[in-house]
């Protein structure tokens, strides 16, 4: 297949989304090997090329139509869209769906000794950040005057180094803030990884491949969120047992050989089956309870 007909997907070369982006595509049946010295990986079994680039380059590559799809954090996407709108550059793309990894929040944080009451406490402060556009939008909405200190990394050390009064940075667990003597004050943006598509017109062949990949991604994520549950149940408490199964739809009920008083139940559950629920099932006479992960789902 010619180069122009190959689907080009941009993913983060290294960082918090890189490994999970690669694993997601492999779970969708895309076979490829990554050479750390090369920026492009060619799929072995599909007309797909993976471009491994800096995360903040991905939105622009998609918006400019250089690549067809990109896997990126919503925070990076939003930051770049604002930047390009201000610069009068193309800033449009289509977000196909959120993914099930990369959860974080963009938050304001100040030193432990700082007395914070509300957002107005930030008036006149110098804030270090890698996300000046998202920070500016938040501060303008609140009517707060401030100055920013643009840093590309190690934002959390800025107050201790005397570069700023506070920071605006990504937070996952808060451990990094705590280690640097900071505490979180305001969440200004919540983010997940997402997959985006260029708005350029695609060939029928390439769009069909995009639809196939998206369908598989949907199936992979549904499978990750679901469990396959099997158990034996007394007929007399069947309705009560089915009602306890979280997220269950239309369970399969099968007779057991030589036992007219009990049945087998098979069900796909979209919620976790916790220990207390299993204990309630047991109290209703359920037995041989198995909870298994699902590798793939479709339909």
Swiss-Prot record:
GO cellular component terms listed in the entry, alphabetical order: cytoplasm
Record-linked CDD domains: PBP2_HisGL2
Highest taxon listed in the record's lineage: Bacteria
Coiled coil: none
Keywords from the UniProt entry: Amino-acid biosynthesis, ATP-binding, Cytoplasm, Glycosyltransferase, Histidine biosynthesis, Magnesium, Metal-binding, Nucleotide-binding, Transferase
EC category name: transferase
Keyword Metal-binding applies: yes
Primary site of residence: cytoplasm
The EC number(s) this enzyme carries: 2.4.2.17
Keyword Secreted: no
HAMAP family the record matches: HisG_Long (MF_00079)
NCBIfam families the UniProt entry points to: hisG, HisG_C-term
The protein's name: ATP phosphoribosyltransferase
Organism: Shewanella frigidimarina (strain NCIMB 400)
Gene that encodes it: hisG
């Amino acid at each position: 297949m010619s180069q122009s007909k190959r689907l080009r997907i941009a993913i983060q070369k290294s960082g918090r989304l890189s490994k999970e982006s690669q694993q997601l595509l492999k779970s969708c049946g895309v076979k490829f090997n990554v050479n750390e010295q090369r920026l492009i990986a060619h799929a072995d079994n599909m007309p797909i090329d993976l471009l491994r680039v800096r995360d903040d380059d991905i939105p622009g590559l998609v918006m400019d139509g250089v690549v067809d799809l990109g896997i990126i954090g919503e925070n990076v996407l939003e930051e770049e869209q604002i930047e390009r709108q201000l610069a009068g550059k193309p800033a449009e793309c289509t977000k196909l769906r959120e993914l099930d990894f990369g959860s974080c929040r963009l938050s304001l944080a100040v030193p432990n000794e700082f007395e914070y009451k509300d957002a107005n406490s930030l008036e006149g402060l110098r804030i270090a950040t890698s996300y000046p556009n998202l920070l500016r939008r938040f501060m303008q909405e609140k009517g707060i005057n401030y100055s920013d200190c643009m840093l590309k990394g190690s934002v959390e050390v800025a107050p201790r180094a005397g570069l700023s009064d506070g920071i605006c940075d990504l937070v996952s667990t808060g451990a990094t803030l705590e280690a640097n003597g900071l505490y979180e004050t305001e969440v200004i943006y919540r983010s997940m990884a997402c997959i985006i598509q260029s708005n350029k017109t695609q060939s029928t062949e390439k769009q069909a491949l995009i639809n196939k990949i998206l369908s598989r991604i949907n199936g992979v994520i549904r499978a990750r969120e679901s469990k396959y549950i099997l158990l034996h149940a007394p007929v007399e408490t069947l309705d009560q047992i089915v009602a306890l199964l979280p997220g269950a739809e239309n369970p399969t009920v099968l007779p057991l050989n030589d036992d007219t008083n009990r049945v087998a139940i098979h069900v796909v559950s979209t919620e976790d089956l916790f220990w207390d629920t299993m204990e309630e099932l047991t109290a209703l006479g359920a037995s041989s309870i198995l909870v298994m992960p699902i590798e793939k789902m479709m339909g």
